[in-house]
Amino acid sequence: MTKSTKKFETEVQQLLDLVIHSLYSNKDIFLRELVSNASDAIDKVKFESHSNMDILEGNTDWKIKLIPDKTAGTLTIRDNGIGMNVVEVEENIGTIARSGTRAFMENLKDKNVQNNPELIGQFGVGFYASFMVADKVTLITRKAGDKNAACRWESTGDGSYTIEDCEKETRGTDITLHLKDEMKEYLDEWKIRSIIKKYSDYVQYPVVMDVTRDEPAKGVDGEVIEGGGTIEKTTEETLNSMKAIWTRAKSEISEEEYEEFYKHISHDYDKPFRTIHYSAEGTSEFKALIYIPSHKPFDLFMRDHKKGVHLYVKRVFITDNCEALLPDYLRFMKGVVDSSDLPLNVSREILQEDIQIKRIEKNLVGKILSTLVETKEKTPEDYLKFYKEFGPVLKEGVHFDHANKEKLQELILFESSKTEAGNYISLKEYVARMPEAQKEIYYITGASRSALENSPHLEIFRKKGFEVLYMTDPVDEWVVQSLTDYDGKKLHAVDRGDLELDSAEEKKEKEAKQEEAKKQYQGVLDFVKEQLKDKVKEVRFSSRLTDSACCLVADEYGLNANMEKILKAMNQDVPESKRVLELNPDHPLMQVLSSIFEKDKENPRLADYCGLLYDQALLTEGSPVPDPLRFTRLVAELMVKAAEK
């Protein structure tokens, strides 16, 4: 293709503006990002070569070369990795090809980017860090296996870039940074050495650089010639140790080394919450270095979130997102697993079914959950910080991972009617403080704590002093389908089915009271049933309500209002179901309705009041009324009549 000029996507330009114009305190990260990208590119070509050796073109001298040129004022980062063709260059550099782009930009707005330059790498766009130190970037690349697929990309970060075909003898990518005048320190040998040592020492490929030294002149016999002066000699030196950190003994690794490796593989520059480093022996031999992050990634709940840890076989890279190694509810884990038992040519498809992978997964999950249980027991404050980030994801395991259900049910936490906002309790703690008269574990699901606190379904529980768990995560509706009991106590939703809260004596007294209410209000009760027969399954007097006039209750195994909302939000078909309308026989409204009914059973206002009762019950649970205009008209009329009295 001939040379053409194209515009960056809006989001890319916003990102470039952020990079170019923000005063970052640590500009060294640009080199870390580019070396990390080069390492990934070599990983990819090695993986592809397992099924197609021809793409290597005989070049297996894996390395990342740094070429500082003080005369030209440029620093080049060269790799012999997978390379890119024109289409891939435009997809990977001209655009941000991820559905999380908007979320990324929002995240930048929400954080103090002056103190968080590492955000760039966290979102997989580390290449743009080049513009922190360069006023022009030139990229020349050729896709492995296609000698005619070389292209040249160039930009000054001004909103556009040029791209054209070019010649390149070998596969891989050269990125040349034309350094700003005030950034020429990055051409200094010792500055480069210090950055590589600090950030990229563990990269498994040699990071090399030509180094020139003055050496004494030597004769043909190799002996130094006295008085012969010195000559310049240039040699290629390796700047990093390349020792895989996970193969080293824990006692040899500093906390700083663990943290730097975490940054390398995760692009998350906060410290990890926990580091799990161990070797497994027996039926399955492997080494694992697993990190539990401190904060959830912005795209954790997006479909294209990259999950899984890096898989190696005998230190040979296989894949960077092996989903088969961990269940979905642990998708936020980062790290490396290096197996001695898998074949080097294992395919991604085989990974899903391989018995060794399943053994590794079982081992990893057990180790991770044990670490979380230990943290919860020994440092509950730390665990709470973790749980506020990852609790909703961890809960998924209760529903899907039956083998580890017992461990997981000890890890999940909830707010409750007896905790302050932001404080949580475990099921174990809940059971320990249950009154002797309480036989079941009570909970209520909803969108938020504030909505649940005002629910009429809680009135009787407050009166009796029974604690109710607040379940405000959408996943909770699925959790309680699997977690039906705990420690011999059944979990019971306060807005479903019948409640058994009373002692035998209290029950007898309440039944007598309800029978009396039925006699007093049977006529109006039947009338309400008839008026609402198309909307509710039944109308009955309530044992839940002490202050409110009415509420809606689902059957024991029926859909409640919260579950219906969640299914609708997911564009799922919601099965048609009717709930029970419960009325409070002690509420003044029942007396008013009964009085009107006894005076004039044909009074047209009675039907309106029945509709208002139903609408009121919907509103108190946070559901919309079916006819808002009719509802507001009736309320306005009632207000006028009340004012006229």
From Swiss-Prot:
Pfam families on file: HATPase_c_3, HSP90
Domain of life: Bacteria
Region called A, residue ranges: 1-348
One Gene Ontology term of the molecular function aspect: ATP hydrolysis activity
Family: Belongs to the heat shock protein 90 family.
Primary role: Molecular chaperone. Has ATPase activity.
Subunit structure: Homodimer.
Name of the protein in its database record: Chaperone protein HtpG
Native organism: Geotalea uraniireducens (strain Rf4)
